[in-house]
Amino acid sequence: DALLQSSAQDRMIFASGYQYTGQPILLTEFGGVAFKTNQSEKDWGYCAIEKNEASYIRRLTSLFSYIKTNRRIQGYCYTQFTDVMQETNGLLSIRREPKIAIDAIRAILFGTDDSEPISPVP
């Protein structure tokens, strides 16, 4: 509820004169969790670059858990699927190789085989 009354990155959620009346909320870009698998000095991320695999997994898990359990959010797009040039925000490297075990990525995105996947849809 507080989010709907504020701005995101200094941008209003709704245009002047409009308000939330129950319409689906789509998070059209989120993520930016940087984790480099090479040692380039030019690597960049939106936040501090995660230093190791464990902290990267914790950060991703935290983000996805919040998004998927928020009942108002009906869809989302993670940024980004792969690293590009100097940005290390991808789930996969620039060579399209998973940065962590593919099973770990799957568990973060969809849950584990022994649990129900978390769904944003009530």
Would you name each region that the model predicts?
Residues 1-122:
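Substrate-binding clefts and catalytic carboxylate motifs of secreted carbohydrate-active enzymes
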